[in-house]
Amino acid sequence: MGAPAERTGTWAEALLTFIQRYPGVHLREIRRRLGIPIGTLDYHLYRLGKRGLVSVRMQGGYKVCFPETLIGEGPPIPEPDKVLIALLRQSVPRSILLHLYLEGTASPQLLGAAVGASGPNLSYFLKRLEALGVVEREGAPGQRQVHLNDAKRIHEILLRYPPLPETPVDRFVRFWSELHP
């Protein structure tokens, strides 16, 4: 675990700024990144929610947080985008969409190898992305191909809502796994 972020204001201010910068972030990731004790985090999320500044909801087994107003960008995030953004905070769905965006249509086997996902894990996320209308699988079993339905929308969301910055531990794990595949 990395060191908690240095505080310059209150935990509520740090929390709101973090959620505005990284909408759809998971509760445990907030705790890990900001070093806020879980009880304090729950308290401040409740208070910010009561003030209409953030919303917290369960999605895919995770508590995810969204700002009700973005920093300097006006209206709240549209509901269909919230589901996709929260999914993109997870590495496998993000890798799937980035691969399809950059490389184009791919078979599930090629996609699984490219993103480092097992068959069941890949299938789980493809079903979720397909239910959102983001990807489509076509063809007979054994000859299936996966493609993006709206590459422009994915591009806009990926640019507008950047991934969380890599921590030193994340970099070490990535480096180590590249050296020892």
Question: Which positions does each model-derived feature cover?
Answer:
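Histidine-centered active-site/metal-ligand motif
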Residues: 26, 44, 125
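Long, low-complexity, charge-rich intrinsically disordered regions
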Residues: 1-21, 47, 58-59, 64-89, ...
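A short acidic, leucine-rich amphipathic alpha-helix
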Residues: 29-32, 110-114
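Short capping segments at the starts of secondary-structure elements
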Residues: 20-26, 103-107
